[in-house]
Amino acid sequence: MYDLFKQLIAVFILSLCFNLHARTADDATTIIRNDTLKDKAAKKAQRDAERLELRNSNDRFKISFDYLRAKLETELSFELPTGNLNSVISLENDLGLPSNSYFFTGSFLYRITPRSGLYAQYYGINRKETSQTQRDLIFKGEIIPAGTDVEAHFNTQVISTGYLYSVLKDRNAYLGFYLNIYFMFVETGIQSAYGLQDLDVELLAPLPNFGILASFKLNKWLYFNGNIGFFALKLDDFGGSIHNYDLTLMAKPVNWLGIDLSYQVFDVMVEFPSDGINTEIDYNFRGPSIGLSFFF
């Protein structure tokens, strides 16, 4: 009888301890849940406040126009699938296209949140020149003898659009990455009195790109902006690569206007078939630019 009484007391004590532990655990869970909800609510309120501040600021939209002086280098390569024909032509050295060009670029930035945004950029370069060939050239399988008067052209239209995201949460600093896609239209060709008319190569290439960008406020009115990007792709009969970077100093005398001084580099190589001939375009430009940015 005494042993039974001890067992009942032990069971009662264990039950009491279990209930006390369960109640303590429930109370702790409730406290943690309440703290989590409060933390989520505080973070949401902070995000809403940051977005409202961005909406009321002059930094949500940015439109930029730049005037660029660029040094250009352009090469065309043609190769038959059998490998019997392999020709490389420099459009500047062999066909007389100007190696320096002045052109405008335009860009637009929309900041969705203080840390993310969408942007788009456009530029176009059209070049045409009449010259006399200094050596025999092979353009798409046709031989152009030395001493032939030719008119060559190379036209480029580029649209870039993408998404950017910053890992920093600082009004005076932006450090993150971007992912974009280039839609590049290229048209090049030769006309000559030799009888070769409109030997054209046309290409519309969507090329993705990935990169890193940074922006820092140096003092009250001076900012530094920079980005660098690279991508390469190779499929069965199509391939390409893009390398670009941009360094900019921007003076901002008022909150809605920026004066930009930049140095830009853009290098693209594209391989594709054209009329049964493996064609490669290697095109790049680099040079300084000056421009204006408008914020609103």
Predicted region positions:
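Short glycine/proline- and aromatic-enriched beta-strand/turn motifs that initiate or cap beta-hairpins
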Residues: 23-122, 295
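Transmembrane beta-barrel architecture of outer-membrane proteins
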Residues: 60, 101-105, 156-160, 205-209, ...
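Transmembrane beta-barrel strands of outer-membrane/channel proteins
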Residues: 65-69, 120-124, 177-183, 214, ...
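Residue-level signature of outer-membrane beta-barrel architecture
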Residues: 67, 110-112, 165-167, 181, ...
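Extracellular/periplasm-exposed beta-strand and loop segments of Gram-negative cell-envelope proteins
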Residues: 73-101, 124-157, 184-203, 233-236, ...
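Outer-membrane beta-barrel transmembrane domain signature
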Residues: 80, 183-254, 266-269, 296
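Repeated loop/turn-to-beta-strand initiation elements of outer-membrane beta-barrel proteins
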Residues: 115-118, 170-173, 220-224, 255-259
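Outer-membrane beta-barrel "beta-signal"
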Residues: 251, 283-296
